[in-house]
Amino acid sequence: MNLMQFSGLLVVWLLSTLFIATLTWFEFRRVRFNFNVFFSLLFLLTFFFGFPLTSVLVFRFDVGVAPPEILLQALLSAACFYGVYYVTYKTRLRKRVVDVTRKPLFTMNRVETHLTWVILMGIALVSVGIFFMHNGFLLFRLHSYSQIFSSEVSGVALKRFFYFFIPAMLVVYFLRQDSKAWLFFLVSTVAFGLLTYMIVGGTRANIIIAFAIFLFIGIIRGWISLWMLAAAGVLGIVGMFWLALKRYGLNVSGDEAFYTFLYLTRDTFSPWENLALLLQNYHNIDFQGLAPIVRDFYVFIPTWLWPGRPSIVLNSANYFTWEVLNNHSGLAISPTLIGSLVVMGGALFIPLGAIVVGLIIKWFDWLYELGNREPNRYKAAILHSFCFGAIFNMIVLAREGLDSFVSRVVFFLVVFGASLLVAKLLFWLFDSAGLIHKRTTSLPQAQVERKL
C-alpha cells in the first residue's frame, strides 16, 4: 500500500467515522444512554478503531495487509451497514401509545428478587468451583492459549455459566443505585473476572464486560464525565494489553513491545482486518444460509442427550477459519458481524442483517425503557439486570457474528428465565410454610405519642 492509496482510504475512514460518531453524539445528547448508543460505539470500535493501528503497522513495521481495494470494501460495507441499521432503528411502524394500562406479564417482590440474584450468583460460583476442581489454575499450567480448547481441559461447557455472576451483581446494584453499590459492583465483578482469568487460562471477557458496564452506569448517573470515560478507555486498553502479554507468555521491550501492542490491541478491540480477509477470499466461500445459526446451538446440547452430536461445530467463525483460510491452529478467527453475514449469504445478506440488528437493538431499548418506567423497583431491577447483562451478547454480535449472538442470547434468556421461575417457586414454598413475614415499619416515638 502506497501513500496515495492510504490517503484515499484515510478519507473514506474519516468520513465514515464522522458519520457514525455524529449520529451517536446526537443520540447521546438526547438520551445520555440507550442500547443504540452502546451498539454504535461498539460498532465504531470493531470496524474503525483498528484502521490507524493497521496503518502504523504497515508504514512503521512493513506488515502485510489485504490489498487497498479490499480494505476499501471493508470500510464501505461497514459504513453502509450502519446506515441501513440506523434507518431501521429510527423507523417507527406504528404510533407510540402513551399511558396505556396493560396487565403486566410478571411481577416481582423483595424476596423473589433477592432469591433471583442469589440463584444467578450460585450458578456462576458452583460452575467455577467444579471447573477449578477438574482443572486447577490453567493460566499457570498450560503453555499456550490454544490449549484451553484442547482435550486436556475438561468441563469446558461450564465456562458458559461463569458470566451469570455479572447479572447477579447488577440486580444488587439496581436495588440500591448509589455510589457505594456502583463501586461494589466494580470490585466484585472485576475480582471475579480476574479469578476466572487465572482459572480458565487467559479469558478476559468477564473483566472487559464488567468494566464497560461500570463505566456506562457511571455515565447514566452522571458520576463520570466524558473525559473520565476516555481516560478509563485508555487505561482499559493498557490493562487488556498487559493481560494479553501474560496470557501468551510474552516478554517484549522496545520496538518489539510497540509492535506487539499495536497488533494485540487491534485484534482484541477491532478485528476489522478479518472482514477484509474474508472479502479477499469471497470467491472461496460456499454460502451457508442460516445453517450456522442452527449449528451454533449444538455446543449447548450435552452429548448424553445427543450421543451423535457432531464434534465439530461449523458456525461462521469455524467455517471462515477452517474452510476459507484453511487454518487449523486450534483457535477460531472472529469473522465480525458483517463477515458472518457474508458467510451466510454474501453481499446480499449485509443490508438484510442490518435490518435484523436494528430490530434487535430496538427491542432491547424498549425493554430498557420499560424498566425505567416501572414503578415496582424490584421488577425494574430485574429488567435492567437482564438488559445490561445482555451487553456481553452484543459484544459477541459485533465481533463473532449473528449466529453466535442468537445462540448465546437464547441461552442467556433460558438461564435467566429459569432462575426467575425457581425464585418464584421457592418464594411460594417458603410462603406456604409460613416462613415469609411482611415487613412492618415502626413509627417514630413522637408519632406514636401523638396517636395515643
Swiss-Prot record:
The chain crosses the membrane at residues 6-26, 37-57, 63-83, 118-138, 155-175, 181-201, 207-227, 228-248, 341-361, 378-398, 410-430. It is found in: Cell inner membrane. Its main location: membrane. InterPro entries: WzyE. Keywords: Cell inner membrane, Cell membrane, Membrane, Transmembrane, Transmembrane helix. It is a multi-pass membrane protein. One of its GO terms (cellular component) is plasma membrane. Pathway: Bacterial outer membrane biogenesis; enterobacterial common antigen biosynthesis. One of its GO terms (biological process) is enterobacterial common antigen biosynthetic process. Probably part of a complex composed of WzxE, WzyE and WzzE. Belongs to the WzyE family. Probably involved in the polymerization of enterobacterial common antigen (ECA) trisaccharide repeat units. This is Probable ECA polymerase. The gene is wzyE.
